[in-house]
Design a protein with these regions (language model features):
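Enzymes that bind and transform nitrogen-containing heteroaromatic metabolites
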Residues: 1-221
């Protein structure tokens, strides 16, 4: 079974995801309404975090296990190339109860061993690129994940949309125009030459803080 996948993004009025101040308090307070079991966060999103996070070069082994009655979601990060070496930092954050790295058959063996030392769960699908359909099925089977909220940039959003895996899209529009300052769009098609329409059904619109508009759509499949 594939979990319900919710794509939720903060954008400027012209659809950019960077180059303007995001109301983070409002963004994450609204995110609570979907009761996510897993936060699917793009690897680049974590690598580009504003904090100066050093790579973990220690050989320390983590044995921490989540409580069975912990209602927090799990953090899921696709990282087929083994680029994320700051799991020690993300494990210390209070937002998630458990941690999963999505890998492939080509993920470096040394990185797989690093993940095991740090107590990071591993889901391995695909050869060069993560097979997201299979990964979502395994999230449901292994962790009981019913709702996944995607917190990422346009590349991962585009891959999931084109694979037909997204159920709902929620866009929090901020009162700003970015223009040429940022090329980052909330939907970047993985194969523009074969791009086509993705049909949506309007669900609702909500005005928040008298400045931000939340638009909600269902993806027609």
């Amino acid at each position: 079974m594939i979990p319900k996948v919710i794509l939720y993004t903060a954008v400027s009025l012209d659809g950019r995801t960077a180059g303007f101040p995001v109301d983070m308090g409002l963004f994450y307070s609204l995110a609570q309404q979907w009761g996510e079991d897993a936060s699917l966060v793009g690897c680049d999103t974590l690598l580009n975090a504003p904090d100066d996070i050093p790579d973990d070069r220690t050989s320390e082994v983590s044995t921490a296990t989540p409580s069975t009655d912990d209602s927090r979601p799990i953090l899921v990060v696709p990282d087929s190339r083994g680029r994320l070496r700051s799991w020690h930092y993300w494990r210390e954050q209070p937002y998630w109860k458990d941690f999963v790295s999505l890998c492939t058959q080509s993920t470096p063996r040394e990185h797989i061993e690093y993940l095991k030392r740090k107590g990071i769960k591993i889901i391995k699908t695909g050869t060069e690129h993560v097979d997201y359909r299979q990964a979502l099925e395994e999230l449901n089977g292994r962790f009981g994940t019913a709702v996944v909220r995607v917190d990422s940039g346009g590349t991962l959003n585009g891959v999931l949309l084109r694979a037909g895996l997204v159920d709902e899209i929620h866009i929090l529009i901020h009162p700003a125009l970015v223009g040429a300052i940022s090329p980052n769009m909330f939907f970047r098609d993985p194969n523009p030459e074969q791009a086509g329409e993705i049909a949506l059904k309007f669900l609702k619109s909500e005005l928040h803080s008298e400045r931000c508009l939340l638009l909600s759509y269902a993806v027609l499949k």
